[in-house]
């Protein structure tokens, strides 16, 4: 299983990302699990080192993607982070 953590505060972008992931899963037959977080603060608070990749929006309320990435790096050096 491939696990993706996604921090995105815009519901329309969340929907678009979900649709792309579902389409990719069907086309490739790869088992992908995506977890959405409303902002960087929620991601950092709930983070567990189970993700293969994190997709972070840079501009979000409470905690932006750059600050969230710095906090995650303190706990997990291996996860790939994409902005």
Region locations from a protein language model:
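Non-catalytic signal-transmission and effector/linker regions of two-component phosphorelay proteins
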Residues: 1-5, 15-18
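Two-component/phosphorelay signaling modules centered on CheY-like receiver
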Residues: 10-35
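Short amphipathic alpha-helical segments
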Residues: 18-19, 48, 67-68
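Acidic, metal-coordinating helix/loop segments flanking the phosphotransfer/catalytic sites
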Residues: 34-53
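Acidic catalytic/metal-coordinating carboxylates
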Residues: 39, 64-67
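Short amphipathic alpha-helix used as the core "switch/output" element in two-component signaling
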Residues: 45, 66-77
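Active-site residues of response regulator receiver
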Residues: 56-58
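A short, hydrophobic beta-strand element within the central beta-sheet of small alpha/beta folds
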Residues: 78-83
């Amino acid at each position: 299983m491939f696990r993706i953590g996604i921090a995105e505060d815009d519901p329309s972008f969340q929907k678009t990302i979900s649709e792309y992931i579902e389409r990719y899963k069907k086309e490739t037959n790869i088992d992908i699990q995506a977890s959405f977080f409303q902002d960087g603060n929620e991601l950092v608070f709930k983070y567990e080192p189970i993700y293969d990749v994190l997709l972070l929006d840079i501009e979000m309320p409470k905690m932006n993607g750059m600050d969230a990435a710095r906090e995650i790096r303190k706990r997990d050096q291996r996860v790939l982070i994409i902005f």
